[in-house]
Amino acid sequence: MGQKVNPIGLRLGINRTWDSRWFANTNEYGQLLHEDLKIRTYIENELKQAAISKVVIERPHKKCRVTIHSARPGLIIGKKGADIEKLRRKITQMTNAETHLNIVEVRKPEIDARLIAQSIAQQLERRVAFRRAMKRAVQSAMRLGAEGIRINCTGRLGGAEIARIEWYREGRVPLHTLRADIDYGTAEAKTAYGVCGVKVWVFKGEILEHDPMASERRAVEGAGDGGGQRRRENA
């Protein structure tokens, strides 16, 4: 079972928490869900170069709080905060609610599964050899503290006539162990031969306390190791 399902979804409520954190009545749920999808799509399209790891959306009473985890926060904030203000106004128009934006820096993008997948996809689009891109990502992750990593690439790799799957694994990636802190990310590479898919699993150790926020708290503590979490709030 653990081999097939999304490892983040399998661990929700155990050591992972949701990226959308709000409660809604039945008649409001659909509208708010579509707003979340629009916000995430807009941010990912508008900030392609900002290395977005994830977008967390919270909705206190008649407000919307959006937290963007990025490896390049400077690209989001812009000169004197001009870009982040423009982004805040756009999200306010989408939600018709008072919007607060927080930017959290990802201090170790080499062990963030989503950012690894995006990096490999970009290299495939630039015609870098897929084996070289995968090996480089595996070596960087293991060097920076990951306990295990697995990378899958699928599609017409290297322009081959027949699509296939290539994968590399180093260290342990215990997908069945629910206490394992496993990060998972996907990306698509739009190449001249067609679309290639990239999946990445990163094992960061075991979380022994039963706490849905434990994984996020560990990420924040890791960010603090490099001189404090970089964070900007825009009301």
UniProtKB/Swiss-Prot annotation:
InterPro entries: KH_dom, KH_dom-like_a/b, KH_dom_type_2, KH_sf_prok-type, Ribosomal_S3_C_sf, Ribosomal_uS3_bac-typ, Ribosomal_uS3_C, Ribosomal_uS3_CS. The keyword Acyltransferase does not apply. It comes from the Bacteria. One of its GO terms (biological process) is translation. PROSITE patterns: KH_TYPE_2, RIBOSOMAL_S3. One of its GO terms (molecular function) is mRNA binding. Keywords: Ribonucleoprotein, Ribosomal protein, RNA-binding, rRNA-binding. One of its GO terms (cellular component) is cytosolic small ribosomal subunit. CDD domains: KH-II_30S_S3 (cd02412). This is Small ribosomal subunit protein uS3. It comes from Chelativorans sp. (strain BNC1). The gene is rpsC.
